[in-house]
Curated annotation (Swiss-Prot):
Lineage of origin: Archaea, Thermoproteota, Thermoprotei, Sulfolobales, Sulfolobaceae
GO CC terms in record: cytoplasm
Protein name according to UniProt: Cytochrome P450 119
Matches recorded under NCBIfam families: Cyp119_Thmprot (NF041177)
Temperature effects on activity: Active up to 80 degrees Celsius. Thermostable.
Organism: Sulfurisphaera tokodaii (strain DSM 16993 / JCM 10545 / NBRC 100140 / 7) (Sulfolobus tokodaii)
Amino acid sequence: MYDWFKQMRKESPVYYDGKVWNLFKYEDCKMVLNDHKRFSSNLTGYNDKLEMLRSGKVFFDIPTRYTMLTSDPPLHDELRNLTADAFNPSNLPVDFVREVTVKLLSELDEEFDVIESFAIPLPILVISKMLGINPDVKKVKDWSDLVALRLGRADEIFSIGRKYLELISFSKKELDSRKGKEIVDLTGKIANSNLSELEKEGYFILLMIAGNETTTNLIGNAIEDFTLYNSWDYVREKGALKAVEEALRFSPPVMRTIRVTKEKVKIRDQVIDEGELVRVWIASANRDEEVFKDPDSFIPDRTPNPHLSFGSGIHLCLGAPLARLEARIALEEFAKKFRVKEIVKKEKIDNEVLNGYRKLVVRVERA
């Protein structure tokens, strides 16, 4: 896909594929992400459910559309400000992240699946602690997959429908149990806010699942990148701070995002009408030759590194500080304990938006 990105940046940086406008250059992608007045995140009405049903797919309306991800100001600002303090770097549970990381690593043998044994449980256990919920890793992962993918084959409708109902029931139960009580966790803060019930459910579900899916991808991608590009010694000597940023740029957990135009706009030589969908290819922007020197090389100490993997503008990822913290500690502790001898098996996620591994089996020796 990266060869296609390079070709499109050169030949058709603003490209209409018959349904959606696609942007490939860093400058254009960042401009759209920063301009919420002309490029909206509110995509209500743009999910063609009939087409999905005809193609043997089933769509479930999960209340995550009632969140800061899919809203514009002033609602967006109200939603974001509700929990912003909890994701301030100075308020993050650093000691707990390290404690969980060390425990998970201590349980691993000489050959293991990085994703299942480490990259999945770590962010789920951390966000569960912050939300004040029982950390059921398997259930939260199942729900995360359901919301992240949002599509299921028609022959899976009953199992997917059951998971969906479990997710909604769980969110309502947790929120209801905290209404009118002292606020001691993020769930309590949401439950006792002035948001509508749908907004509360959407907010709770977003916090529970949004970060863990992308952080899992980040950790898995970074372990592969550090192994393939011989970066583990750098991490042991200098720490993982800059190397995590390079993993975010080189192998972004999310390949692209989407906006809808609120008025007629012109990008380069292309005029885009109001109400058109615009696909922002973050993965392509992160390899733009005009911004990044030697963009197709993995350089663990790359400076500066203005990648767009956490977005930009008002929708800059709220959980970015937490994801960075989890990834940095995870990779530094991993480097202290192990040396990767071989990547035994890997299986990519089959998804146009999410970029990561379903399975990443490594063979290691003690460092």
